[in-house]
A protein has these predicted regions:
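C-terminal regulatory/oligomerization modules of transcriptional regulators
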Residues: 95-153
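Beta-hairpin "wing" of winged helix-turn-helix
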Residues: 53-67
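Key DNA-contact positions within bacterial/archaeal DNA-binding proteins
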Residues: 40
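Short amphipathic alpha-helical interface segments
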Residues: 10-22
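Alpha-helical residues within the helix-turn-helix
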Residues: 33, 50-51
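A short alpha-helical element within helix-turn-helix/winged-helix DNA-binding domains
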Residues: 26-36
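Conserved segment of winged-helix/HTH DNA-binding domains
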Residues: 71-96, 108, 112-116
Length: 153
C-alpha cells in the first residue's frame, strides 16, 4: 500500500492540532513549522480538511485552524478520506463494486478484506489517541509482532 505525502501531511497536521489541545486557532505557519510540512502544500490540505468538516478556519489576526469536532470523535480514516477519498479502491473503483470471473472471482473478496483491515486500524484510532500517544489494544497487539516490522520485497 502506498501512502501519499498528502495523506501523511494531513494526518500530521490534524494530530498536531489535537496535541495542542487548544480552542484557540493555530496558524498554518505554526503547524507547518512544527511538522516540517511545506506551507503552500499544507494550506491546500487544510482547505480539504475544512471542506470535509474536520477542521474549521478563522480569519483575521487571531485566525488560524482548529479541529471542528472533539479529537476523540475524529478518526484517522476521517482525515484520510478528506484528502484522498476512499481508504481502498482498485483503479478508482470501490472493492465491493468490482466484478471478476473465472479463476479470479475471489479477488473481489481479497480487496474487500484489505479494506476491512485498513478500517480496523484507521476507523478505530482517533486524533485523541494519537495526541495522547496511545493506540487501541488490537493495534498494539499487531505492532508488537516482530513480523509486522519485517521489510519484504
Amino acid at each position: 500500500m502506498r501512502i501519499s505525502a498528502k495523506t501523511d501531511y494531513a494526518l500530521r497536521a490534524a494530530i498536531e492540532l489535537a496535541s495542542l489541545g487548544t480552542s484557540d486557532p493555530v496558524k498554518g505557519e505554526a503547524i507547518a513549522t512544527a511538522q516540517g510540512i511545506p506551507l503552500r502544500f499544507l494550506e491546500n490540505i487544510l482547505g480539504d480538511l475544512r471542506n470535509a468538516g474536520v477542521v474549521e478556519s478563522r480569519r483575521g489576526v487571531e485566525g488560524g485552524y482548529l479541529l471542528a469536532r472533539p479529537a476523540n470523535e475524529i478518526t484517522l480514516a476521517d482525515v484520510i478520506r478528506a484528502v484522498d477519498g476512499p481508504l481502498a479502491n482498485v483503479a478508482g473503483t470501490r472493492p465491493n463494486l468490482l466484478e471478476y470471473h473465472g479463476s479470479t472471482e475471489k479477488l473481489r473478496e481479497i480487496w474487500v478484506g484489505v479494506r476491512a483491515a485498513l478500517r480496523s486500524v484507521l476507523e478505530e484510532t482517533t486524533l485523541a489517541d494519537m495526541a495522547e500517544k496511545k493506540l487501541p489494544k488490537h493495534i498494539e497487539k499487531m505492532v508488537a509482532d516482530r513480523d509486522a516490522w519485517e521489510v519484504r520485497i
